Amino acid sequence: MDAIKVAVDIPSGLSADTGDVLGIAFAADFTVTFAFQKIGMLFGMARKLVGKLVTASIGIEPSVYDGRGDVCYTYDRTDLKNLLPARDLDAHKGNYGKVLLIVGSPGMAGAAYFSAKAAYLTGAGLVQIYTAKENQSNLQQLLPEAIITTYERYEEEKLKELLEWADVVGIGSGLSMSETAQHLLSTTVRCVKKPCMIDADGLNILSKDRALFEKLTPDCILTPHMKEMAGLCGHSVKELKEERFRYFQEFLGLIPSVCVMKDARTLVGRDGRPVYVNTSGNQSMAKGGAGDVLGGMITGLLAQKIEPYEAGTLGVFLHGLAGDAAQKKKGSYSVLASDILDGIAEVLTAESTEMILREKC
């Protein structure tokens, strides 16, 4: 007869800091941990060996850890009511921000579409896409709600006019590493005076032009996946996986901006702020376009005057919840980026309905 295996505090043989197996580890069906979840339980083999986790209070107050740099935090669904921006009854589109997305090289209309639609679905008031001319027809059909402005070559004055128009800027998705893309990124980073999200090829260009790091501001958000992060910080993906918190916090100390380091467990941080560890989302989201959706969501939240650090944490959490909603419908194999877009509306519809009901009670 198989026994039910219960671990106390953390399964023997697991690192409480990293989740690594230290030789041989106990595989539990349940783990009863004391006071607070250990950070290592969220990573590595620990996710498989902890089993169902129960946190038992032993009288330790969270305030004991105030000010400690090695303490992280997470969100759960109940936090949404305090995180989502209010929607005023008498609002117009101008209240929710003008987004400029500099995205999509020739043939990469999909990246532009996913970013722009995600910004709209997350609540942005108006989205303008600045993209290669070859993408214009596709985007006008895919997303008629967006303003489509195009380029055939780099035009500095035109770009500066668009940057002046916008309340928030997102750049990088599907942008390529072309000379035109490099000029677009360089001018944006040097000239933008608004919150700015930099993703994908924007990060790859940034990693090769270290002088641009000096131009990053506290209003910028960088959203690298692990390979892009390796290019930015100079450590291999293997090193980042093995000592993610050390190298993540080391990188945060080099920039004034927010960093969203994307992985199965995404980290969000800013120098001097606690690190957020995301626990929403699932393996079905490992598909092309999912990162473009996240970039658009974060930009859409910035447009609603959410501060960059909070826009990063909330955007990542909502993105994961949208992926969880998509997985329930499509399973672990068949989820596409477009399904994650549908999941955004599902998550926010459920939450807004609850908010309306609370207001009426």
Language-model segments: residues:
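Small-residue (G/A/S/T)-rich helix-start motifs and N-terminal tracts that mark the onset
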Residues: 41-196, 204-221, 226-361
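Internal gly/pro-rich beta-alpha loop/helix module
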Residues: 1-70
